[in-house]
Amino acid sequence: MVSVKAYYNETVETVRRDLNGEQYKDFLVLILIVSAVVSLFLGETESAAVILVVITMNAILGTVQTIKAENSLESLKQLAAPEAKVVRNGAVVRIPGREITVGDVVHLEAGDYIPANGRVLESASLKVDESALTGESIGVDKISAPLTGELPLGDRRNMVFSGSYVTYGRGVFLVTGIGMNTEVGKIAGLLKNTSEKKTPLQINLDRFGKKLSMIILLLCAVLFALQVLKGGAVADAFLFAVALAVAAIPEALSSIVTIVLAFGTRKMAKEGAIIRKLQSVEGLGSVSVICSDKTGTLTQNRMTIEHYYVDGRDIPADQIDPANPLQEQMLKFSILCNDSTNVEGQEIGDPTETAMVNLGDKKGISAQEVRDACPRSSEIPFDSDRKLMSTFHKMKDGYTMITKGAVDVMLKRVDYIQKGGKIFPVTEVDVENICRVNEQYSESGLRVLGIGYRHFPVEKNISTEDEQGLVFLGLLAMMDPPRTESAAAVSDCKRAGICPVMITGDHKVTAAAIAKRIGILDDISQACEGVQIDGMSDEELNEFVENIRVYARVTPEHKIRIVRAWQERGNIVAMTGDGVNDAPALKQADVGVAMGITGTEVAKDAASMILTDDNFATIIKAVESGRNIYENIKKAIQFLLSGNFAAILVVIAASLMNLPVPFAPVHLLFINLLTDSLPAIALGLEPYHHDVMGKKPRPVKESILTKEFLIRVGVEGGVIGAVVLTAFLIGYRDGNEVLAGTMAFAVLCLSRLLHGYNCKAGKPVIFTGGFFDNRFMQGAFLSGFVLLTAVLAVPVLHGFFAVQTLKIGELLAVYGLSGVSMLVIQGLKRMVKF
């Protein structure tokens, strides 16, 4: 939620959700509440109490997990409370950023956070990091000159924006917008109008709960009517109907799903993914499109030198040799004409300049030693209009001015070129070769700078007039390279039937180059810019997105439209982002993924998952976990429904055969809540299988209750129901209802404990192995068996559970019939492979 504070320069205020209330919105939980009320009305206080305990446990589990995730989020937040330097009464004073108002004149220097939107009045090499708004970490050079036309935010160089900060230089700006009237405020407005989506599992469980409730009501009504028509007492008919309802409702399902998802979040947290919204764990398994930011997610978020062009040769960075005089000169000159430093591994300065220092460090050239040997005495700072930077140094053999900057600008000031160890007048052929290489580098998405120099006989304070008659030394080409694991992650993505899409604020050429290198893009025709989207209707965009893999120079509005277009085509969409500009799309996506390291507070609050390593590959691991969790939840549901179906069949059969009600409600609740829950949880924690990533995402509308699934439930429930009815008939041969109920209860309980092994996988574990690969299942079986034994063997419990002591022969019958049910189902799985 977003609130606006009047009169103050404040944008968004995060409000915690009603975490406990959210746990009671699930449809199955509502069914349990109704069943508890009915049980209480019929005098079954024990049943009602147990059901209410289950509901409360489920709410506590969900709330605790969500709070833990929220606390993990809090540990990632590093909130800034900036002050601002403004002109008040003719003097520059510091005031809290929230007190700034339109019309204030604000002074900026390196390290300052920009507290409001404004028009630049003065710029002394002012450079601003706008990555929170544009997603691009390279600083933007600010100017005071007017600009014309409608420009994207990243190109409005005479404006500064709230949410960004100064990385270099100084400046002054006039405040033109505060609070909700800033770019951040506009994004906050978009967040208001973006609703969160339910995951496929939530939708499936809602549908399942509604269908199940209708089936239960219908069966109860039919059974009640049959009993009354047969002349039975209304009270007895009601008892049959209640027994059927209790047998049919999987009371523990909601708790089991919550526990399985919670365990999944723990595993994913160890792999670098913090889950803020529990249901998102499974939602990841349904993802069919991943819209990823480029900078820092697919790339290293660290500018790196890729190539040198020296002495007429292209030299890849890994082949640069400091033993070569010209290459050594390039390394040293790029360090000298440079303001960045590397202090104990911490890079300080402009990313393009730190790339030069880092390369020198890799090649064994210390920046500090080079600078100490060739001290700087004067400089001409970089200017965005001039596009050059020059520094003046005392060398062993005299004085040298080193100049670096845009290639086209530098070539106009070059008169000479260094080849080998000699200097020659530059020729048209030399210029053509340099321009050709520069164009090749640029088309590959590389940022290119030229390095030149000029010797002076004496020391002087250089000026722009001295930036003439330069000797061209070479080109250096750099980029923010892909993460080493990005290409493999994209390949895994495609193998899993997931479409990877890059959405970035960077330029199209750069984005396309990175996308090609990691396998997202096959052809440049699959890349477009945000301005192309502006002229499209929603219907046109829905068709357009299918063929586009890279979107460049996009706005927050573009991102939302792209996500919605994919969703309109029936896809489950994951969206990554780290900036304030990403927040609306993160919320719109089915699964919003924020960056934990570089992400802003607003982005993290809008997301359902946070990556602690900002790595695209971690998303793929999370998708794999989500798919495995869904498969395991299906196994748990299959286990619960087949066991409940067995109990339903026995109750209906007893009614049709004019036999007493086979189970007391407490029998079924004991089974459903204890001996059933443990194996179901164990199934939810089955070992993960990597083969899930070799399949396409399941269809969005695919129900859990598929034809094949229902057949398995029906067959397995029928087998278990048959042996339970047999046990009931054996116990009832002398008309002893308590003995019959005890044997039916014991066989149903033990058969369902063994049935956990039947549901482990598609293969029969007895014949093919895998019986002992899940320690949770061993613990579940032993725990359930001990609980059943205690109920049957401890006399003080007999009254509460409506059972009696079994003789040796009766116990053997219980064990034998339970074992038969498992062997029959395992045999059917081996023969029919259902």
Please provide the spans of the model-predicted regions.
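Conserved cytosolic headpiece of P-type ATPases
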Residues: 1-694, 704-705, 718, 745, ...
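Alpha-helix capping/termination and helix-coil
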Residues: 338, 570, 623, 627, ...
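Helix-coil boundary and interhelical linker segments in multi-pass alpha-helical membrane proteins
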Residues: 655-664, 728-740
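Generic alpha-helical transmembrane segments
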Residues: 675, 720, 742-756
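Membrane-water interface at loop-to-transmembrane-helix junctions
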Residues: 699-718, 738-742
